[in-house]
Amino acid sequence: MSATEPQDNSIQSVEQLLAHALAMENEAVERYEMLADQMETHNNPEVAALFRKLAEIEKLHVDNVNDLSDGHTLPHIAPWEYAWQTPESPEAPSASADGLHYMMHPYHAIAMALEAERKGVAFYERLAGQAGREDVRKIARELCETEREHVTLLEGWLGRFQPPPKGWSEDADPPLPQE
């Protein structure tokens, strides 16, 4: 079972699905904002601005899930009860991802976001294929389509940037840890 595969059809209702979707989107917003703050701290304003833009896009996804949730009472799900196999939701960009570096380029930020969005697509695709109820499959397909649109957007953005040159992370005067 992959990290993005729902566990044992644990999402059995629309309400459970929407609670998971809301958690995924909120975690993505928080992670992008955290990454933007880190890039600002390290005087990397271009990448910080990109992460802020990604957070804004994810906030639109939160709004979409909230709209879908109208009329539903969403359950509280403890962090260890989510239907993904990792400590982070499938859509959250990993804070420990390869390429996460204070001197990272926009290319890295977009590639990181693209990987996270593809994991979100995979999560919803699997759920749409495994769910026992048609209403859950329908919402999973809708959420998957939203994530696919984000993947397409990010692929377009990535095409505008060249991979950074070899040695991009070398710093003649690296920051020192503070005690």
Named regions from a protein language model:
Residues 1-179:
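Iron-associated oxidoreductase/ferritin-like identity signal
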